[in-house]
Amino acid sequence: MKTVRKTSVFPAKRDVVFSKLQELSTLQYIAAPYATFTPIDSAQPVVWTVGSTSSYRFRLFGFLPFGTHTIHIERFDRDGIRSKEGNEHVPVWNHPIILRDIGDQTEYTDQVDIEAGLKTVFIWLWAKAFYAHRQKKWIRMLKEQNHEYNRN
């Protein structure tokens, strides 16, 4: 098993970050173009709550099919999220997200434990780049929203 851990300071209060974490559109925005997540059951809205499980068509770089990715939520509160995830190619993708309030900003940590047999090292290398990318997109999104809020 290999672990990726990435921490950044986000330019928004923890409640704002937690609110955005609850939206599938946030995941879809921050993951692109490294990955795309399309709900299997598009007729049902995605609602992440403790105990919920949801499945997505997962594509690497938006076009390479990489199986059905399942997310099971074990914890979901203002301090963060813990999910057990995986797919046919990566059976273990355990992902705590830790949110720490630091005034008008939030310390945000992604930690991912990965197990994919012989593919683990390659998936781990991709995941290091993916989580650095995700956090940069988070920061860009929050800055743009803050700019829009201040303009109005």
Task: Name these PLM-found stretches.
Residues 1-47:
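Hydrophobic ligand-binding cavity/cleft-lining segments
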Residues 39-86:
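Glycine-rich portal/gate segments that line the openings of hydrophobic small-molecule binding cavities
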